[in-house]
């Protein structure tokens, strides 16, 4: 059967830029899936998604004009029950009637268990045109659109008004109606650069015709790559680099159909403003690409992406420079105004900034952060007074003009203003870095003082918000407690502090009775669960479970333990020792009395005496290895007792009739379990 390329295009008004690429990919994938289900393509559909500000399109290769004929077998009642005394039963008659057949047309087939009556027929394949309308409509319905709209007198809804529909199979129009539009082969190109209506001659020529006649680069990926290449080329010419921002590149790609990269500039005096402010206003407000010199310093040149190509782009450049000048003047004004007051003098204003109505203002929060940060700094061997000072000033920039305009700069502006106020560089850096890590993969605070304030900030948030009942559920986590927990855990894996003790310190910083009394234990459990999720990114689940079963309170040696268990798991003896450990734990659960020391005089059989001797020899070796942090050695020592463990379980009845002997054997196993589980619960390996 011959096949041809299928093209579908929805011509719209300007689509939401931040959603464009996602819409294009979803639309294309849904159409391809519909064609696969309808068996209009063989195997997986080969398709290309197109998305530009005014269109969503998909091009699918090797689409059939007609479905292949299908042999259908409808199975009915069992032969044994379908005929009684030579007469068809009601079940058989009903099956034939429902299948639209006569009884004499039925055949007998085997369904894998028994012979059954069946009706076999050939279903003629339906033409593409009879199936495509529903496929497109379903693809439109499945689009991830949070808000839809109506337009004109239409009763149809979509993310933006739709004004044109192309459906081409090869060079032929497939007649369908979607969103109240009849399909055709006409579309529009660039709003200003195109000559008008474009007739798409063939589904395969779409991209080339849109580029040549329409001045539209229809492929989102193609436009993005072209913009990226042009930006990098312009930057190299200026001996600069583009300030990286993938989200901005995606957004700009979604704003233009015919991208043209232009160079522009601004007055040097604006560079006196912290470059983070200038970069943010250029990227966020104007969608420009700032340029950095070889030292990473902002230059007074920038790149912009225009949707127009003209012989003289100077008027476009001047217009953009004029708009940016106003924005940068605002930033300069905010910066100068903020310098009229020190961070310390701003602290009283934090009393009017509500953190949460149940746990007070930011001013009250600062008091808690100071005490927690000082405590952590002492534990880290850092300057507690410096940590307390950094915590005191950490939130002062929230009431500055600059942070009021650009909340993303909180912490960063605090650093700059702290420097201007004469605070030490260590305190200034800690003010900025106390928000780190902000997200998975973000860098950690660089100094112990910064880490102390960062831990204090996240612990106070986690314990306080949890303590008033605002616990994360499902995908709802408005106070980002999961992110706070992740940040705490990553820092504690670097610093050897007791996580439970820190949680208690944070809890004690709140007024007595304000938080739920179960908060410390509940947040500790929450942290343990988040730790498992974090570690499972790099280690198998059973290894993580084995290490965390010991409920470690210090996390700085976790990586070493995980790596040691991973090596142990590869030993030939590992599986048998894990099984033996599980058996030991099950036996210990049956102990009637408190477990204690082994009484050598009650050891009766050679196997238990040998195991006791092996355990005696093992004890100092494992203790020394664990004390030195050499967990791999500690675990590898276990392999030496496998013969004694095997012999013990083969020849000794642990639950002996003599109560004293039974208790002594359980004491021996308890001692062995302590050695086997010194690093991790190896019984969990392989589960």
Curated annotation (Swiss-Prot):
PANTHER family: GLYCINE--TRNA LIGASE, CHLOROPLASTIC_MITOCHONDRIAL 2 (PTHR30075:SF2), GLYCYL-TRNA SYNTHETASE (PTHR30075). It holds the Pfam family DALR_1. NCBIfam families: glyS. The keyword Transmembrane helix does not apply. It is found in: Cytoplasm. Keywords: Aminoacyl-tRNA synthetase, ATP-binding, Cytoplasm, Ligase, Nucleotide-binding, Protein biosynthesis. It comes from the Bacteria. This is Glycine--tRNA ligase beta subunit. It catalyses: tRNA(Gly) + glycine + ATP = glycyl-tRNA(Gly) + AMP + diphosphate. The gene is glyS. GO terms for biological process: arginyl-tRNA aminoacylation; glycyl-tRNA aminoacylation. Coiled coil: none annotated. InterPro entries: DALR_anticod-bd, Gly-tRNA-synth_bsu, Gly-tRNA-synth_heterodimer. Tetramer of two alpha and two beta subunits. One of its GO terms (cellular component) is cytosol. It is an enzyme of class 6 (ligase).
């Amino acid at each position: 059967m011959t096949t041809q390329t299928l093209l579908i295009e929805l011509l719209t008004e300007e689509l939401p830029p931040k959603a464009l690429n996602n819409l294009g990919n979803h639309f294309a994938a849904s159409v391809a899936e519909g064609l696969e289900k309808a068996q209009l393509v063989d195997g997986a559909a080969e398709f290309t998604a197109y998305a530009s500000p005014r269109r969503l399109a998909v091009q699918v290769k090797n689409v059939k004009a007609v479905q292949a004929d299908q042999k259908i077998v409808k199975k009915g009642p069992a032969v044994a029950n379908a005929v009684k005394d030579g007469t068809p039963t009601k079940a058989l008659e009903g099956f034939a009637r429902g299948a639209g057949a006569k009884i004499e047309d039925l055949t007998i087939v085997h369904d894998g268990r028994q012979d059954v009556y069946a009706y076999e027929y050939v279903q003629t394949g339906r033409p593409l045109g009879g199936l495509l309308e529903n496929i497109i409509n379903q693809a439109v319905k499945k689009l991830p659109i949070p808000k839809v709209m109506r337009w004109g007198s239409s009763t149809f809804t979509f993310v933006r008004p739709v004004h044109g529909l192309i459906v081409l199979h090869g060079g032929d129009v497939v007649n369908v109606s979607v969103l109240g539009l009849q399909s055709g082969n006409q579309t529009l190109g660039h709003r200003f650069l195109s000559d008008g209506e474009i007739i798409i001659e063939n589904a395969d020529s779409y991209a080339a015709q849109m580029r040549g006649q329409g001045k539209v680069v229809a492929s989102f990926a193609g436009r993005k790559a072209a913009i990226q290449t042009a930006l990098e080329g312009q930057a190299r010419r200026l001996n600069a680099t583009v300030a990286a921002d993938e989200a901005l590149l995606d957004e700009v790609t979604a704003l233009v159909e015919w991208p043209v990269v232009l160079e522009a500039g601004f007055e040097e005096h604006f560079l006196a403003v912290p470059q983070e402010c200038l970069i943010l206003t250029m990227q966020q407000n104007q969608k420009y690409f700032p340029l950095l010199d070889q030292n990473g310093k902002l230059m007074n040149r920038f790149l912009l992406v225009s949707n127009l190509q003209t012989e003289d782009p100077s008027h476009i450049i001047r217009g953009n420079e004029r708009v940016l000048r106003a924005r940068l003047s605002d930033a300069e004004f905010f910066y100068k105004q903020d310098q009229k007051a020190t961070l310390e003098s701003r602290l009283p204003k934090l009393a009017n900034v509500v953190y949460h109505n149940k746990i007070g203002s930011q001013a009250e929060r600062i008091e808690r952060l100071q005490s927690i940060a000082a405590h952590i700094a002492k534990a880290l061997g850092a300057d507690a007074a410096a940590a307390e000072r950094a915590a005191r000033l950490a939130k002062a920039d929230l009431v500055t003009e600059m942070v009021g305009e650009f909340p993303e700069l909180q912490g960063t502006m605090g650093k700059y203003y702290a420097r201007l106020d004469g605070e030490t560089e260590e305190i200034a850096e800690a003010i900025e870095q106390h928000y780190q890590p902000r997200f998975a993969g973000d860098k950690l605070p660089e100094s112990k003082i910064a880490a102390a304030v960062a831990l204090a900030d996240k612990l106070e948030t986690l314990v306080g918000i949890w303590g008033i009942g605002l616990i994360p559920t499902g995908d709802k986590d408005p106070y980002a407690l999961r992110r706070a927990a992740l940040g705490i855990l990553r820092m504690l894996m670097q610093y050897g502090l007791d996580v439970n003790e820190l949680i208690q310190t944070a809890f004690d910083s709140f007024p007595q009775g304000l938080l739920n009394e179960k908060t410390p234990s509940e947040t500790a459990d929450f942290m343990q669960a988040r730790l498992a999720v974090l570690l499972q990114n790099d280690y198998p689940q059973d290894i993580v479970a084995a290490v965390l079963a010991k409920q470690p309170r210090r996390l700085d040696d976790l990586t070493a333990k995980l790596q040691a268990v991973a090596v142990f798991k590869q030993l030939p003896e590992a599986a048998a020792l894990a099984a033996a450990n599980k058996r030991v734990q099950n036996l210990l659960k049956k102990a009637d009395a408190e477990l204690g020391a082994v009484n050598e005089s009650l050891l009766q059989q050679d196997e238990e005496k040998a195991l006791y001797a092996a355990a005696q020899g093992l004890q100092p070796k494992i203790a020394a290895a664990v004390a030195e942090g050499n967990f791999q050695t500690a675990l590898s020592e276990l392999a030496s007792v496998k013969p004694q463990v095997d012999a013990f379980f083969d020849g000794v009845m642990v639950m002996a009739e003599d109560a004293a002997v039974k208790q002594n054997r359980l004491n021996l196993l308890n001692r062995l379990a302590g050695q086997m589980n010194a690093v991790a619960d190896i019984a969990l390996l392989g589960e």
